[in-house]
Amino acid sequence: MAKEKIEIVVANDDTRIEKVDQVLPPIALLEKYPASEHAAALVKQTRHEAHNIIHGKDDRLLVIIGPCSIHDPKAAIEYANRLKPLREKYKDSLEIIMRVYFEKPRTTVGWKGLINDPYLNDTYRLNDGLRIARKLLSDINDLGVPSAGEFLDMITPQYVADFMSWGAIGARTTESQVHRELASGLSCAVGFKNATNGGVKVALDAIGAAEAPHYFLSVTKFGHSAIVSTKGNEDCHIILRGGDKGPNFNAEDVAKVCADIEKSGRIPHVMIDFSHANSCKQFKKQMDVCQDVCNQIASGSKQIFGVMVESHLVEGRQDLVDGKAQTYGQSITDACIGWEDSEILLKQLSDAVIARRKVTSN
């Protein structure tokens, strides 16, 4: 009788699973690509700088800038090499962190990122994707450029989170309980985007939830299933990315959100996403959003502490042809501004911060 019951359980299990493959334990990649002393020190320092900006102890602007997603490590390294001197040039006014996104949430289906499908050919070599991602993060941080990423699941952070100086929870997952729990345990600052419908309450609720301790299921560095107990993350904040009803980067919208933040007892300031619904999904409009935000900052507003920008070597986007990108340094997901505009944008942001200092010092 007992044997019959076991057979019934097995017969009804995994009925829609095609196959299950083994994944490398995190420790295998952490040992293969360990963080150098230089990289570890950079991450620690950048996290500290981000903390100070978020908590109003540093008047510089936190700038998350880089490709919508990474599909070509070579182009990502070139981007990092170009960004490094600008990070140094504007260090007194901007804390620049490179956007290094390996995972893409999809509204329906599509390429889910370098970790999920590193060869862009639907082979889903996730072990290779994890290797490539960690090696790239190691290389970028060793260059002296800190990295930022989006977190989509409870396991991948064990492979890459030690290289992340800042993290994001996207608009589609901000309301998710498990992502709030994850954010509560991440060692870096985490931004929650407002909902795709433009609502900000879910993001504010998420911040409150992530500040608290949680227990959730994940894996250890050795790949064993585990119960994770977190301390809570005091470095969470909101990202305004616009919504179905339009942008929310203008001064009036920012003031409304800041009023809600202040009611919750937190510092009333926000990060602005220049892309997505704020640019009406027209990549060149990121420059218009930048100009508006710079005007707010230069006028003395302290309600904006950070910005996000989708930027690449070559402007626009491209579709894959036979599983290959035809244009080097151009996005295969959301369209991005090109390098020339990126340089202009960073200078404008720096000038705005300098102007704000003059206004507020009088």
PLM feature spans:
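Conserved phosphate/anionic-ligand binding catalytic regions in large, soluble enzymes, centered on
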Residues: 62-75, 334
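Conserved, mostly hydrophobic/aromatic
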Residues: 66, 272, 338
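Internal helix-turn-beta structural module
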Residues: 312-357
